[in-house]
C-alpha cells in the first residue's frame, strides 16, 4: 500500500451534510483488507507490479492483423474478378467454337462452386447472473503460471480502484475487495494523473488502459488468477450534460473502446475473457445497446478469444441481466425483437393470466345472501 494517509478520505458527507456510516464502514474494511494482503500476498504483488503494462491506443499486433485481413480481402476480390473475367472469355470462345461442348461437360462447368470465404471462428458466449469475481473463481485457474483468463475492470479513468479505499461501491471496487488489485493500482498514480491532465476528452476519455498480470482472487478459501484489463468506458451521462455530445458519437466512442479491450485480450493471448454491463447505469449507457455492441464485435471474427463470460448480476433496480441475456441469446445472430417488445408481451400475458384468475375466483365465490 502506498505511504498515503487515507484515514480522512472516507469522511465525505452525504448530500444531507451528514457522514455516511455504511460507506465509512466499507472504507475501514478496505483499509484493513489492503494492509492484510500487502503482507499475505507480498510476492504476488511484487510479481504483478513488475509486469504491469500500459496500452495507449490500439495494440500494434491488432493493427497489423487488421491490415493483413484487409489485404487478404482485397486479394480475394481481385482473384474473384480475374476468375470471372476468365470465365467470360472462355464462354465467348465456346460460343464461336465449331462444335458445342457435350451437355454433361457444360453442366459440370456451370455447377462448379465458387470459392468460399473461410468461416471465422467465433467465441462461445455465456451470460451469468453472477459477479465478475465469482465468474473468475468458477472458470479460472489456480496457478499464476497457467493463467488463461482476463477480466475487464470497469475502471475509473482518474481514481485508482474507483473509490474503493473511500468505501464506494462498483464492479472495480468489488474486484479490489477480493484481491490485491488496489495495492497495485495505487502505485500507478502517474498514469492516473496523466489521464486527468490530458485525456478527459469531453468525458469520452481515450483508449488508454493498464494491464495487471495474473492477479490472485480469493473468496471463501477458493482462489483463481486472471489478468486485469483496467479500462474506462466513456461517461455518457456527463458527456451529454456537460458537453452536449450526441448519442451517435457516444456509441461510436464505446464501440471503439470495446474493440480496444478485445484487442488487448488478443495481445495478451488469453483464451477466456470476463466482461459485463460496461458503461451502464452510472455511466449512462443503455444495457441493451451495450450488449448489442459487444455482440457485433464478437461476431465480427476479428478477435481470437475462445470463451467470453458476461458477468451481469441481476438486481432489483435495473434490467441489465435480462437485457444482456436477451441480446446474446441468439449469438452470433441478432435478436430480431427488442427487449421492450418481449417485456411488453410478457407483461400482457401476465396481466391476462391475473385477470382470468380473478374472474374464476369471482365465479367460485358463493353469494351469502341466498342463505338468508
Which residue ranges define each predicted feature?
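Macrodomain-like recognition of ADP-ribose-binding/processing modules
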Residues: 1-372
Amino acid at each position: 500500500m502506498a505511504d498515503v494517509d487515507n484515514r480522512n478520505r472516507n469522511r465525505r458527507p452525504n448530500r444531507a451534510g451528514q457522514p455516511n456510516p455504511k460507506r465509512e464502514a466499507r472504507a475501514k474494511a478496505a483499509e484493513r483488507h489492503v494492509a492484510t494482503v500487502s503482507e499475505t500476498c507480498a510476492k504476488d504483488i511484487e510479481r504483478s507490479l513488475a509486469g504491469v503494462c500500459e496500452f495507449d491506443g490500439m495494440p500494434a499486433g491488432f493493427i497489423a492483423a487488421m491490415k493483413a485481413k484487409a489485404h487478404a480481402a482485397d486479394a480475394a476480390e481481385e482473384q474473384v474478378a480475374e476468375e470471372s473475367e476468365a470465365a467470360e472469355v472462355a464462354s465467348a470462345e465456346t460460343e464461336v467454337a465449331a462444335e458445342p461442348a457435350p451437355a454433361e461437360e457444360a453442366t459440370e462447368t456451370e455447377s462448379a462452386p465458387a470459392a468460399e470465404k473461410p468461416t471465422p471462428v467465433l467465441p462461445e458466449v455465456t451470460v451469468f447472473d453472477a459477479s465478475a469475481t465469482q465468474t473468475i473463481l468458477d472458470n479460472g485457474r489456480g496457478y499464476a503460471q497457467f493463467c488463461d483468463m482476463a477480466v475487464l475492470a470497469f475502471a475509473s479513468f482518474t481514481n485508482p480502484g474507483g473509490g474503493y479505499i473511500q468505501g464506494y461501491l462498483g464492479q472495480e471496487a468489488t474486484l479490489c475487495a477480493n484481491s490485491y488489485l488496489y495495492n497495485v493500482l495505487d502505485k500507478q498514480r502517474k498514469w492516473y494523473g496523466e489521464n486527468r491532465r490530458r485525456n478527459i476528452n469531453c468525458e469520452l476519455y481515450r483508449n488508454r488502459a493498464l494491464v495487471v498480470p495474473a492477479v490472485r482472487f480469493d473468496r471463501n478459501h477458493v482462489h483463481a488468477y486472471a489478468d486485469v484489463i483496467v479500462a474506462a468506458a466513456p461517461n455518457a451521462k456527463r458527456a451529454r450534460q456537460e458537453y452536449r455530445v450526441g448519442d451517435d458519437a457516444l456509441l461510436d466512442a464505446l464501440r471503439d473502446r470495446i474493440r480496444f479491450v478485445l484487442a488487448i485480450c488478443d495481445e495478451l493471448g488469453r483464451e477466456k475473457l470476463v466482461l459485463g454491463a460496461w458503461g451502464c447505469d452510472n455511466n449512462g449507457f443503455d444495457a441493451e445497446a451495450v450488449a448489442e455492441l459487444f455482440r457485433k464485435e464478437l461476431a465480427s471474427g476479428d478477435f481470437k478469444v475462445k470463451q467470453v463470460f458476461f458477468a451481469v448480476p441481476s438486481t432489483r433496480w435495473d434490467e441489465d441481466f435480462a437485457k444482456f441475456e436477451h441480446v446474446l441469446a441468439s449469438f452470433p445472430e441478432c435478436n430480431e425483437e427488442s427487449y421492450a417488445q418481449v417485456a411488453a408481451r410478457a407483461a400482457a400475458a401476465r396481466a391476462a393470466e391475473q385477470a382470468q384468475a380473478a374472474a374464476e375466483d369471482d365465479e367460485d365465490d358463493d353469494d351469502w345472501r341466498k342463505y338468508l
